[in-house]
């Protein structure tokens, strides 16, 4: 029964994401978590620079944007899966850019840790409770560049030239990315320069992935993992 379940499971997974796209997709998530939590574990007690501007201080706290801030994880999952369903070369070009961006984030998080000023949460309403919960589980660090903004912009860049993706969904993805940018500002999770840094880093890394041959390095490594996955599936 277990063998039959695993066969059905793999058939279902490969039906969503081709075998060559599975490793880069999963590793993207794993590496992102390692960068974010690892840099926090290393630099959590270090001095953090506050780079918020006067404009940041004047912008209001709008907790309703937490809907976008939390909901964007669904947006990320959907679009990264759409990217992983592309042709092999495009998959590795995109995820090469994705990995490079996280390497840059890790360097910046350790070389120049940043923080910001968060509002005092004193109410007992649903939005106050949600904001308080977010602040309690997500320390004000690893802010520049904003990974929320970086990933959201990647979500748009990764599908904008896909002919199989409807134009309306490309527009939706662009709109959602911009809403995520706004959510990071109005929930006081990030400041303006964090947003700009995330978008610029995503754009630069995406160009590197598309215009250089760096993807071959990642693709060779990914191919070895892909073969091991296929061998494992064959023995199920």
Spans of features found by a protein language model:
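Short hydrophobic alpha-helices at membrane interfaces in multi-pass membrane enzymes
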Residues: 166-178
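Membrane-interface loops
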Residues: 39-54, 84-168, 216-233
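Membrane-embedded alpha-helical segments of multi-pass membrane proteins
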Residues: 30, 68-75, 147-151, 196-200
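Hydrophobic, membrane-inserted alpha-helices
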Residues: 75-79, 152-157, 175-183
């Amino acid at each position: 029964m277990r063998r039959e379940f695993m066969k059905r499971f793999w058939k279902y997974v490969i039906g969503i994401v081709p075998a060559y796209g599975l490793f880069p997709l999963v590793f993207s998530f794993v590496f992102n978590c390692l960068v974010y939590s690892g840099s926090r574990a290393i630099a959590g007690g270090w001095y953090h620079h506050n780079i918020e501007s006067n404009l940041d201080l004047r912008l209001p706290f709008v907790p309703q944007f937490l809907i976008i801030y939390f909901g964007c994880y669904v947006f990320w999952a959907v679009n990264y899966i759409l990217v992983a369903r592309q042709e092999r070369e495009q998959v590795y070009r995109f995820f090469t850019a994705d990995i490079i961006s996280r390497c840059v984030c890790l360097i910046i998080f350790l070389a120049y840790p940043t923080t910001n000023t968060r509002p005092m949460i004193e109410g007992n309403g649903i939005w106050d409770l949600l904001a308080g919960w977010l602040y309690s589980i997500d320390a004000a660090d690893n802010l520049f560049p904003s990974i929320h903004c970086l990933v959201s912009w990647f979500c748009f860049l990764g599908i904008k030239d896909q002919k199989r993706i409807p134009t309306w969904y490309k527009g939706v993805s662009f709109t959602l990315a911009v809403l995520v940018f706004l959510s990071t500002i109005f929930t006081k999770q990030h400041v303006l320069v964090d947003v700009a840094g995330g978008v610029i880093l995503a754009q630069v890394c995406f160009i590197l992935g598309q215009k250089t041959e760096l993807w071959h390095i990642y693709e060779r490594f990914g191919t070895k993992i892909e073969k091991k996955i296929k061998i494992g599936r064959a023995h199920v």
